[in-house]
Amino acid sequence: MANRTVKDAHSVHGTNPQYLVEKIIRTRIYESKYWKEECFGLTAELVVDKAMELKYVGGVYGGNIKPTPFLCLTLKMLQIQPEKDIIVEFIKNEDFKYVRTLGALYMRLTGTATDCYKYLEPLYNDYRKVKVQNRNGEFELMHVDEFIDQLLHEERVCDVILPRLQKRFVLEETEQLDPRVSALEEDMDDVESSEEEEDEDEKGRDPSPEHHRRNYRDLDRPRRSPSPRYRRSRSRSPRRRSRSPKRRSPSPPRRERHRSKSPRRHRSRSRERRHRSKSKSPGHHRSHRHRSHSKSPERSKKSHKKSRRGNE
């Protein structure tokens, strides 16, 4: 029959490879249209062409449990059991991300714990987005590294129960597996090595102590006169400007504000000052103008005598 496993197929985990998929899901796959039309008579070489046509990842969806093409091709690969080299090429394919995810799922189902860690962990560096169809038939976005993390740590992926996987630290203790080195650590090592090289270059460029002494001696010498270009940029002092009047453009003379020297204003100001100084003293209550007009008879006699003496 078309649904039987090939005769020369090896048992996987002590059982028929197709039995890794649950019976109810397996029967739904056999009854699906995609299985009957697209998966009939496929070989290991033709599976690659069908895998390149995949548009999303998923298990079963809907109320009547319809399988996705991704799950149908997974069961077909379990049935024909392609060689390990073909699966490794699936995983290493960088052009088609769904071909890579299909090979990763098949390796997780059929490979040993050492092979799973060896071939799947490098895919942690693949950050491309893939479409995933959930049980409700809706599409979600996921990254390839997330899908690989589910394969290595979860019990069920794409509605398929995954075989038990041995812990990584156990394989490291038995020296079956080397400690994992992440791509981030490699980048950090590259950055540190580049920084060390830059430090060495800077040390090589550092001048010797004799050069420092020369620089210190040079500080005592008189400074060189600035270049003509630097001279032009300097702003001239007012002395230099006064020395070179020819270069300056003749400007109109400035109008200075002269104080008015009229005798009337001068007299009025002097009178105001006297009035202020006398008003500050407590004994004087009369105004300056009243004192100037009202003179005593004694003062008038004295002034008259002085005028007569001057005439004589």
Swiss-Prot record:
Subcellular location: Nucleus
GO biological process per UniProt: mRNA splicing, via spliceosome
Any matching Pfam family: PRP38
Ranges where the record places region N-terminal protein interaction domain: 1-179
Compositionally biased tracts (Basic and acidic residues): 202-223
Statement: the UniProt record of this protein carries the keyword Cytoplasm: no
GO CC, one annotated term: U2-type precatalytic spliceosome
Keywords: mRNA processing, mRNA splicing, Nucleus, Spliceosome
Compositional bias (Acidic residues): 184-201
Region (Disordered) location: 180-312
Biased composition (Basic residues): 224-294, 301-312
Family from the record: Belongs to the PRP38 family.
Complex formation: Component of the spliceosome B complex.
Protein task: Involved in pre-mRNA splicing as a component of the spliceosome.
Name recorded for this polypeptide: Pre-mRNA-splicing factor 38A
Protein's organism: Xenopus tropicalis
